[in-house]
């Protein structure tokens, strides 16, 4: 095809795959969709991306971007042109005060943790696939993970983005020279962004609905919150990238705030005989705050009986045995579907503060019926096992489904 012939003029043949085997391999992600790309191109730089997008536009061919391919809903597969940005996209820089980090899309999330750990800082988004997922996918899919919630997801910690638009234009929203040039070359683009912003804000009901939608955990669909959060059109453009799944632009670099990493941590796996009781306990724990006004509970992850069964949780197996052989108060004989776990984490700046947090949580939970005693551990080798269970629960549940089904 003409596109391929032109692409070979600036992309070496060894980085262009058209054979059936490698196209099949690259047409796979962590979801259940199957699309086989016609061409796979391993990109190595921003200039290549710009030229590829302009070329695809001339030939009216769709293209899809892929980093690690750990997405669950088909974001990283294509039946047209698949542009891979993994290897050779691993650059980074950390600000002198360690409060900002600039990243290319191909660096793995776990690697970012390792880079920041010596400075007592961390990368806030923490998807379960963080040991494989890359920054490009984490940001563009708004993969918020288990602990960052809504207060520290990609949208909240993003400061600026360097992107390549469909026409090949490179825009760095954190660079004044780039912004000024873009205002000249894309004046109408900026005008339309501002018009959308003003229309959204003029509709009070819509604006309030958007604020509410993003006050709860929400990682699907295009991110509309920037239209009510920001005045500057370049801030809006940068934050529109979060959750866009690569449909609006290619993310070549992102600058994000880092988060303070508490040195003292403790976790507990709390078990309840009903999911209702577990949810009531979570609501109560959310109200706990320390002397400094910070939340006492930093993370609370609910695992239903199916999640526990999929990882052969020992407490679930014990519970299942008990209800089969005897009757537990408030539980129907043989009904194993009620047991619910809440993986709870608290963090502190000192061991004394950590002990105070644990006591406050234990006191709060005394008003609820737990299946097992509340037992926090501050030993990393112990609580890391709890979080490994949580990280592994999704693929484990998926593994229990019947062949050929998707749920």
What residue ranges belong to the model's regions?
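N-terminal glycine-rich flavin-associated loop
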Residues: 7, 31-63, 81-128, 143-195, ...
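Short, acidic, Ser/Thr-enriched surface-loop or helix-capping motifs
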Residues: 71, 96, 134, 165-166, ...
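C-terminal substrate-binding/cap subdomain adjacent to the FAD-binding core in PCMH-type
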Residues: 138-140, 147-154, 158-391, 395
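Glycine-rich anion/phosphate-binding loop at the beta-strand->alpha-helix junction
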Residues: 134, 141-142
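N-terminal flexible segment immediately upstream of the FAD-binding catalytic core
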Residues: 1-58, 68-99, 128, 151, ...
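Short, hydrophobic/aliphatic alpha-helical segments
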Residues: 49-62, 116-129, 133, 221-242, ...
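Short secondary-structure capping/junction motifs at helix and strand boundaries
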Residues: 62-66, 120-127, 297, 368-374
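Glycine-rich, histidine-containing beta strand-loop boundary motifs that form or position
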Residues: 20, 65-69, 76, 105, ...
């Amino acid at each position: 095809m003409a596109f391929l012939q032109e692409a070979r003029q600036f992309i070496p043949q060894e980085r262009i795959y058209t054979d059936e085997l490698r196209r099949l391999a690259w047409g796979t992600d962590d979801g259940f969709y199957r699309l086989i790309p016609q061409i796979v191109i391993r990109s190595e730089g921003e200039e290549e991306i710009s030229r590829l997008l302009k070329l695809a536009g001339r030939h009216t061919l769709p293209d899809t971007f892929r980093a690690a391919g750990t997405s669950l809903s088909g974001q990283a597969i294509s039946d047209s042109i698949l542009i891979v940005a993994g290897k050779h996209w691993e650059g980074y820089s950390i600000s002198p005060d360690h409060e900002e980090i600039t990243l290319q899309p191909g660096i793995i999330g776990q690697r970012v943790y390792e880079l920041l750990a010596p400075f007592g800082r961390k990368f806030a988004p923490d998807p379960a696939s963080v040991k494989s997922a890359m920054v490009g996918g984490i940001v563009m899919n708004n993969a918020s993970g288990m602990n960052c919630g809504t207060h520290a997801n990609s949208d909240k910690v993003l400061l600026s983005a360097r992107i390549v638009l469909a026409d090949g234009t490179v825009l760095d929203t954190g660079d004044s020279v780039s912004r000024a040039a873009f205002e000249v070359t894309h004046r109408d683009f900026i005008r339309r962004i501002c018009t959308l912003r003003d229309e959204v804000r003029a509709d009070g009901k819509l604006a309030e609905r958007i604020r509410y939608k993003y006050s709860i955990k929400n990682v699907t669909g295009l991110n509309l919150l920037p239209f009510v959060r920001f005045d500057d059109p370049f801030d809006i453009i940068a934050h529109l990238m979060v959750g866009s799944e690569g449909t609006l632009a290619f993310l070549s670099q992102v600058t994000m705030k880092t988060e303070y990493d508490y040195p003292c941590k403790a976790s507990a796996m709390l078990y309840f005989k009903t999911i209702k009781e577990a949810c009531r306990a979570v609501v109560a724990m959310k109200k706990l705050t320390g002397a400094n006004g910070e939340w006492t509970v930093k993370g609370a992850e609910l695992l239903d009986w199916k999640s526990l069964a999929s990882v052969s949780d020992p407490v679930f197996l014990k519970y299942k045995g008990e209800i089969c052989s005897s009757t537990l108060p408030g539980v129907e004989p043989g009904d194993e579907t009620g047991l619910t776990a809440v993986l709870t984490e608290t963090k502190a700046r000192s061991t004394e503060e950590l002990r105070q947090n644990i006591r406050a949580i234990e006191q709060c939970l005394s008003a609820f019926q737990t299946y097992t005693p509340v037992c926090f551990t501050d030993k990393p080798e112990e609580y890391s096992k709890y979080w490994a269970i949580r990280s592994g629960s999704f693929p484990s549940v998926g593994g229990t489904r019947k062949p050929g089904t998707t749920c």
